């Protein structure tokens, strides 16, 4: 039995100090640091990307809830929007 335990131990990788329950910072020591390569994208490209993402979210929200979040107004559809005053 001792021989079987020895082979199992040899097959298993060395125990690591970072487990799934440990925080992310515990594993950082073992990982090599990557150098930043390249530069940030141009501001126009970032703005175009974010504008497209924002309009996509607005379209999906309007289709789902028949409410235009850009104009902040209800649309015709399956829901009836009623103003509630607190």
UniProtKB/Swiss-Prot annotation:
Pfam families per record: CDI
InterPro entries: CDI_dom, CDI_dom_sf, KRP
Signal sequence range: none
Example of a GO biological process term: regulation of cell cycle
Cellular component aspect of the GO annotation: nucleus
The keyword Glycoprotein is assigned to this record: no
Annotated Low complexity bias: 1-15
Family statement drawn from the similarity comment of this UniProt entry: Belongs to the CDI family. ICK/KRP subfamily.
Name the record gives this protein: Cyclin-dependent kinase inhibitor 6
Species annotation: Oryza sativa subsp. japonica
Gene: KRP6
């Amino acid at each position: 039995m001792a021989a079987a335990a020895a082979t199992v131990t040899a097959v298993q990788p060395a125990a690591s100090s970072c487990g799934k329950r440990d925080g992310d910072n515990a594993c950082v020591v073992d990982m090599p640091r990557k150098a930043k390569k390249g530069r940030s994208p141009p501001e126009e490209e970032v703005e175009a990307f974010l504008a497209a993402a924002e309009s996509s979210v607005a379209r999906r929200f309007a289709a789902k809830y028949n409410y235009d979040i850009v104009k902040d107004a209800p649309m015709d559809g399956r829901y009836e929007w009623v103003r509630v005053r607190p």
